[in-house]
Every structure is written in structure tokens, then in C-alpha cells.
């Protein structure tokens, strides 16, 4: 069958028009499919980076040991304005030091706690009941016996004040110098021994030693409230100053003269060294006497607080005779 030129042109136009239409439809469908696939794939993508990202407002995980709040995984620095333990709080209330609050463990209202609460109420001091866990955190692990107090920090004195306390009492000065004692239980026990022996003051270094923490106050059983305390920059310089004030320096060290063969009829400063290192070389060189406690058993050393009690009680008796 023949076809005219005009007919051929019409068929070609129709063919190309259909092809263009089909191509456009296919292109549109492919574009839509790609868009859908891209959108779908994006919904499965993880956030940028390989680690877990907390949501908005979430707190980041702390590194181990990074929590420094009371009760966290790292103990807080022990404050010096917290007094813990029944005897310590009772003596605190007698001492005249300003007390802000008394904290009592919930349910503990018997024995000496009752006396403490009654005295606090009489003095107008708020008494607050708290959980035992809060007391533990507040006292940084001290043996608080269900009670603690928030008080003004103990006021430190200078060396001259300690010596003047002895003169005002008409007594020969007896001062305890703690050269780097780091264990709070030991320091608390030394303070307790010193007060019982009638010592007039304690000298502590500002660095490389424990401060007057809740554990120290608890271990002192209230003796700290009746003891003058000087905190010095340098123990060796403090020893030199005490010598200028008329005191003789007695350092407790192994290998010295037995303490009972030494003349204590004078103003005396007794130096007790740290648990591990003992007395520093410079302090030893500045000492007038090196005294020791003879050992007759198989163990060749005493706890620093035990040694202090032996020497201080002997020194106090000899000063008074």
C-alpha cells in the first residue's frame, strides 16, 4: 500500500511525540524512585560519628573517678567545719564555738543523743533529722555515731598564744609538734592524749599532713574543742621559734635516750613524726634531745598516738613534780 509524503510526515511526528512522552514519563518515574529510595535510606542512617550521642539536654557520662560530690565515686575533700561523733558534738556545745546546725540520724533519739538534742534546743540551735547515708557523706566516712554538727571552723592560734596559755595557768609549757602525721585517726588520738596530759597546744603543718577533718574530730572524742592549735608553714621554723620562746625540743625517735632518763623539768615541745617517714632530718638536727621508748618484745615500734601517750603523760608528771 502506498503512502504519500504528507502521510509519512504525520506518522513520523506521531512516533517522535510518543517517544518523547514515554521518555519523560520514565525519567519522572526514575527521579521519583531515586528520591524515595534516598529518603528511605536516609531514615536508616546512624548519626554522625561512631559513639553514642546523648539527646538534647542530657548530661554526658562522667569519666571514672570524676564525681566529686559527697556520696559520688570519689570522696569529697573533708571540710573542717563538720564535727562528728557524740562526745565531739557534746564538747563542741560546751566550748562556745558557734554552731549552725545539728544533724541527727532519723530514729536516733536515745542516750547521749537526747542530751545533745536538749542542749541544742536550749541554745537555739536547729536540730535536723537526716538519713544515715547523708551523715556518712557529710562526715566523709567518719564514725559519726548518728550525730554531726555544722560549726564555724576552729580558729587557729600562733605559737606565742600557746606558750602564753601555759604562763596564764602558772604551768611549764607542754606543746606537741606533729611533723607530718597523715592518718586522721592517729592525729585525733594524739590530740586526745595531749589534752588528757594537760598539754597547752598542738602544732600542725599546713601541707603534707592531715587537717582537722571530721574523722580527726571524731577520733579526738571532743578533746579538740579544748586544745589550742597552731598551723604553721614550716615545722623546722616553728621548732626554732619555740626555742626562742624558751622551750626545749624533745624529738621522739628510735635509738634515743630512754624517755624516763631525760630531765623534763622545763618548758617542753615534744615532736612526733609521721607514720612512715618519722621526723624530718632538719627537725631532728634542731632538737635538743632525742628520746625513745625501749622495746622489750618482738615488735619494735608503737603507733604514734600510743608513743605520744606514754611520753606526754610522763613529761606532764615530771613537770608538775
Task: Describe the function of each predicted region.
Residues 131, 152, 179, 205-206, ...:
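Short beta->alpha connector loops at strand-helix junctions that form conserved
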Residues 90, 95, 196, 214-223, ...:
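Structured adenosyl-cofactor binding patch, chiefly the S-adenosyl-L-methionine
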Residues 2-8:
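Extreme N-terminal basic, low-complexity initiation segments
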Amino acid at each position: 500500500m502506498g503512502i504519500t509524503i504528507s502521510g509519512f510526515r504525520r506518522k513520523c511526528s506521531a512516533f517522535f511525540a510518543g517517544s518523547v512522552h514515554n521518555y519523560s514519563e520514565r525519567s519522572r518515574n526514575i527521579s521519583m524512585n531515586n528520591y524515595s529510595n534516598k529518603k528511605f535510606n536516609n531514615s536508616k542512617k546512624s548519626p554522625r560519628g561512631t559513639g553514642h550521642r546523648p539527646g538534647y539536654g542530657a548530661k554526658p557520662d562522667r569519666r571514672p573517678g570524676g564525681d566529686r560530690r559527697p556520696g559520688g565515686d570519689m570522696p569529697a575533700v573533708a571540710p573542717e567545719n563538720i564535727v562528728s561523733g557524740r562526745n565531739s558534738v557534746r564538747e563542741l556545745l560546751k566550748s562556745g564555738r558557734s554552731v549552725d546546725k545539728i544533724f541527727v540520724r532519723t530514729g536516733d533519739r536515745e542516750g547521749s543523743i537526747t542530751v545533745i538534742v536538749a542542749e541544742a534546743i536550749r541554745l537555739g540551735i536547729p536540730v535536723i533529722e537526716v538519713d544515715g547515708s547523708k551523715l556518712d557523706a557529710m562526715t566523709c566516712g567518719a564514725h559519726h555515731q548518728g550525730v554531726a554538727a555544722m560549726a564555724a571552723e576552729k580558729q587557729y592560734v600562733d605559737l606565742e598564744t600557746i606558750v602564753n596559755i601555759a604562763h596564764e595557768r602558772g604551768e611549764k609549757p607542754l606543746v606537741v609538734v606533729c611533723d607530718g602525721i597523715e592518718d586522721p585517726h592517729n592525729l585525733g588520738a594524739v590530740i586526745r592524749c595531749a589534752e588528757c596530759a594537760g598539754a597547752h597546744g598542738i602544732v600542725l603543718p599546713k601541707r603534707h599532713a592531715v587537717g582537722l577533718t571530721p574523722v580527726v574530730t571524731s577520733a579526738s572524742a571532743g578533746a579538740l574543742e579544748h586544745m589550742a592549735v597552731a598551723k604553721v608553714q614550716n615545722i623546722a621554723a616553728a621548732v626554732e621559734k619555740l626555742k626562742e620562746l624558751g622551750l626545749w625540743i624533745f624529738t621522739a625517735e628510735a635509738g634515743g635516750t630512754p624517755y624516763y632518763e631525760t630531765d623534763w623539768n622545763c618548758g617542753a615541745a615534744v615532736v612526733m613524726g609521721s607514720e612512715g617517714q618519722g621526723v624530718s632530718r632538719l627537725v631532728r638536727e634542731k632538737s635538743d634531745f632525742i628520746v625513745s621508748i625501749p622495746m622489750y618484745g618482738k615488735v619494735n615500734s608503737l603507733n604514734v598516738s600510743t608513743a605520744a601517750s606514754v611520753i606526754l603523760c610522763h613529761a606532764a608528771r615530771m613537770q608538775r613534780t
